[in-house]
Amino acid sequence: MLQNSGIRDIVIKEICDIAEKYEIEKVILFGSRARGDYKKTSDIDLATCGGNHVLFALDVDETTSTLLKFDIVNL
């Protein structure tokens, strides 16, 4: 599924590393990037379960190596 998301591998790794740092149990990609019908400038929609959602969201927004915007929700 991530192969068709248009998200670079390094950004996926950064998100995974940050999720581990804040003890996020699950990160779910949803929206246009999950469906594969995204545009070049589409944001990255993520849902999280567990851990420190607020710090995770701030860290992802500030430290990942992409100019794309994130929309992160807590389940």
Identify the function of each model-found stretch.
Residues 17-18, 34-37, 60-63:
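Short, flexible, glycine/charge-rich loop motifs used to bind or transfer phosphoryl groups or to couple energy/partner
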Residues 24, 30-32, 56:
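Short amphipathic beta-strand starts and helix->beta connectors
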